[in-house]
Regions:
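N-terminal, Lys/Arg-enriched amphipathic/low-complexity engagement segments
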Residues: 1-45, 95
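Short histidine-centered loop motifs in beta-beta connectors
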Residues: 42-51, 55
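Short hydrophobic beta/alpha edge segments that flank linear recognition/processing sites
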Residues: 52-66, 81-84, 91-98
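Conserved hydrophobic positions within beta-strands
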Residues: 75-77
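Hydrophobic alpha-helical hairpins/lids featuring a short glycine-rich hinge
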Residues: 88, 94-157
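Gly-rich Lys/Arg/Thr-decorated short loops/hinges at beta-loop-alpha junctions or inter-strand turns
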Residues: 130, 155-169, 294
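Hydrophobic alpha-helical positions that pack around
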Residues: 149, 193-194, 199-309, 315-320
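Ferredoxin-type iron-sulfur electron-transfer modules in oxidoreductases and energy-metabolism complexes
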Residues: 347-363, 373, 377-452
Length: 452
């Protein structure tokens, strides 16, 4: 990890920073994919024709790392089909036609908490995931702190929100600071054995002075909570970057995050986790920033998860024909093919770009300027990664790829942003990382087959 970490200045474009979230009118129907988290897809437990209520479990988790799915409106299950994912695969999707009542399920009541195990079980049942983009199940992240080989002395609450345009976390801090406070107290009470003496650092960029002031007021009597102000430079929200800038510790590829003595949790994840523990209502809605050059009236909206993106765009309006629609931030969000796609648990923003701003410049040959290395928070040479990927001998290719440090890539796209040749550098790194994962899985499978 280099000393001058996180040094890219990108236009903030936080047009909705002062806009209190507005709850949308109830959509006619919602579409709930089974892959709204990292890990195995959830498995539907309802059938077509079933009547469901808000907060009702409709899909159970499958496998070691998974997350349940709950009904986000009350109504009738009209279809259990499939849809294409942003990564090219398919997943099951449950379609619910709303009855307009938003009637809560009888199961929605605060869980009974007695110890760490019951606390983690409740977080698991809530369906909470990392809402900053990774979508890692929150219970699994917290559970890692129980590893006897780790000593977690710092909990980093990621409130950086460093991507341009997005202000959903900012608004969560302004509207529900008490949920954040409750979340910290739940961790202190039920994970005290594993987080004993831990300091809680709310890591927030300096471009949110109103939120900083409110948080300082909220926690002024809590000596174990620090408001850690960060420079408003990109990519402060990447976990490796935040670890270094908040603690001075360096993340090493291949090691779990708590092995560095820290847990990191998104500020909205923490707040909504607390809301579930207080009320019993699982993750069924979220704040979504809708913005971009083609959006007529940028807004922060509160919408049921599963609402079609087209429903949000009807509210904000468009001032030109969309050239590209991105879910997430402009740096590492995902472009979608259809505005009929639904928002999911991690959909913190919908950005609409007009045809002019959506056109990518034509790529040319690398000029070896070194800007990608200079601006990479972990100092990766993407040009070297590109060359190594073309080596014929697989063993040599794998060894040299590991030596490039590509596994430490944080997917921030800083390299692509600064490349004067407009090369798809992020995609080169992602392809290399995927290749190394496939290779490792194949080697593991071969080893297990040999041992049988």
């Amino acid at each position: 990890m280099k000393k001058d970490i996180s040094s890219l200045h990108v236009p903030h474009n936080k047009h909705t920073a002062a806009m209190t979230p507005v709850r949308i009118d109830l959509p006619h129907e919602v579409f709930l994919p089974m892959n709204m988290h990292s890990g195995h897809d959830a498995e539907p437990i309802v059938m077509v024709g079933d009547q469901v209520r808000v907060g009702q479990l409709i899909a159970r988790e499958e496998g070691r790392f998974s997350s349940p799915v709950h009904a986000t409106v009350s109504g009738t299950v009209t279809e259990i089909g499939s849809m294409e994912t942003a990564k090219g695969g398919t997943t099951k999707v449950i379609r619910i036609e709303s009855d307009g009542k938003m009637e809560p399920d009888p199961s929605v009541k605060p869980p009974v908490l007695t110890d760490c195990d019951s606390f983690l079980a409740a977080v698991r049942e809530s369906g909470m995931v990392g809402l900053g983009g990774a979508a890692f199940p929150t219970w699994a992240k917290l559970n890692e702190a129980k590893n006897p080989d780790y000593h977690v002395d710092t909990v980093l609450i990621n409130a950086a929100e460093c991507e341009p345009y997005i202000t959903s976390d900012h608004q969560m801090m302004l509207t529900h600071p008490e949920w954040i406070a409750d979340g910290i107290e739940y961790l202190r009470k039920y994970m005290s054995e594993y987080l004993s003496g831990a300091v809680y650092k709310i890591c927030i960029e300096k471009n949110k002075p109103d939120a900083i002031e409110l948080l300082k007021k909220t926690f002024r009597e809590k000596e174990y909570v620090q408001i850690h102000e960060l420079n408003a430079i990109y990519p402060q929200g990447a976990k490796q970057v935040m670890l270094y800038n908040a603690t001075g510790r360096v993340a090493v590829a291949g090691r779990r995050f708590p092995s560095f003595g820290a847990l990191i949790i998104n500020v909205s994840s923490l707040a909504l986790m607390a809301n579930y523990l207080n009320t019993g209502m699982p993750l069924v809605e979220r704040i979504v920033t809708v913005d971009g050059p083609a959006v007529k009236n940028p807004m922060n909206l509160i919408a049921p998860i599963g609402t079609r993106i087209s429903e949000l765009l009807k509210i904000t309006g468009l001032n030109s024909e969309p050239g590209k629609v991105v879910v997430g931030g402009p740096m590492n969000g995902s472009a979608i093919c259809s505005v009929d796609d639904p928002i999911v648990k991690v959909s913190n923003a919908v950005l609409v770009f007009d045809e002019k701003s959506a056109v990518l410049p034509k790529a040319s040959a690398c000029i070896n300027c070194g800007r990608c290395i200079e601006k990479c928070p972990v100092g990766i040479s993407v040009a070297m990664v590109d060359r190594v990927m073309k080596i014929d001998d697989e063993e040599e290719r794998v060894k040299k790829l590991i030596d490039t440090g590509v596994r430490q890539c944080v997917d921030c796209a800083s390299c692509s942003y600064v490349c004067p040749a407009h090369r798809p550098l992020l995609q080169i790194n992602q392809e290399a990382k995927s290749y190394l994962k496939r290779y490792a899985a194949e080697q593991k499978e071969k080893a297990e087959g040999t041992s049988k």
